[in-house]
């Protein structure tokens, strides 16, 4: 009985209209097989919820349990989580901000046209930049996302909105993945992507440049979706006092959680790393 530690047994028996002997007989009765199973499931549900940093709600907890071999229905998972007071992190409202085009820089055509599909890794990369607010000021985050697995293959941060932060993210992605010529790189028309240094690096590796239409963030929707997840699942739940703290939080989310373990609905509820291992090997 869940309130037996808060109130005297006699008081509980009077409120519930049962005798003391009946209460003790009920408490000493051996648990049923389903009760034992529920205890085991609750322990595993708590573990999955904890491993997700408290992010997963019942749909993703259910998928994680099924992947681990547990024969359980999604409604039972939702009920057990509700009884245990477990819930996913509610997403805050997220506002998309269009990047202004640098009028003096050339723009590549939109070769993607919102067809965010790739048959293999390193066929289509998406690049984007966002701002993270801290008490110290803005932190600028640049990412490279592989559309095939939604994996973040390169990222970098800077205290200032310099072109070098996007260039550093691209350098990291190229060094990690070593893509073959013909890879399509899609971004907005911001100056960070149209500048000479960035375009030279793309040309050096035979990477084909593609750019969104002016002021249309949906032309780069998966990258925007990643920023939404990063902020609503993670960053918005912290008070970020400094850029160093913010960068540490970004590192933990991308390298410790998102790439390795976060279940992605577009990947059949697998993580980017799991999906690449499953499909490529």
Give a label for each model feature.
Residues 1-281:
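Charged DNA-binding/catalytic regions of mobile-element recombinases
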């Amino acid at each position: 009985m869940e309130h037996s530690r808060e109130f005297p047994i006699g008081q509980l028996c009077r409120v519930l209209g049962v005798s003391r002997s009946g209460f003790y007989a009920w408490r000493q009765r051996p648990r049923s097989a389903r009760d034992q199973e529920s205890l085991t499931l609750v322990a595993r549900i708590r573990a999955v919820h904890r491993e997700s940093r408290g992010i997963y709600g019942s749909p993703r907890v259910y998928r994680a349990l099924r992947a681990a071999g547990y024969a359980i229905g999604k409604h039972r998972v939702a009920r057990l989580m509700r009884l245990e007071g477990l819930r996913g992190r509610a997403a805050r409202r997220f506002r998309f901000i269009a990047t202004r085009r640098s009028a003096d820089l050339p723009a590549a055509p939109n070769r993607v046209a919102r067809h965010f599909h790739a048959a293999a890794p390193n066929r289509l990369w998406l690049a984007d930049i966002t701002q993270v607010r801290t008490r110290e000021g803005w932190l600028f985050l640049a990412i490279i996302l592989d559309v095939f697995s939604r994996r973040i293959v390169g990222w970098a941060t800077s205290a200032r909105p310099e072109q070098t932060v996007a260039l550093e993210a691209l350098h990291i992605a190229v060094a990690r993945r070593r893509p073959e010529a013909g890879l399509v790189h899609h971004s907005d028309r911001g100056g960070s992507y149209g500048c000479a240094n960035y375009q030279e690096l793309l040309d050096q590796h035979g990477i084909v440049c593609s750019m969104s239409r002016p002021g249309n963030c949906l032309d780069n929707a998966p990258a925007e979706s990643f920023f939404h997840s990063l902020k609503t699942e993670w960053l918005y739940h912290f008070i970020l006092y400094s850029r160093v703290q913010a960068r540490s939080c970004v590192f933990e989310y991308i390298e410790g959680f998102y790439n390795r373990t976060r279940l992605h609905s577009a990947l059949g509820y697998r993580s980017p790393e799991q999906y690449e291992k499953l499909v490529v090997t």
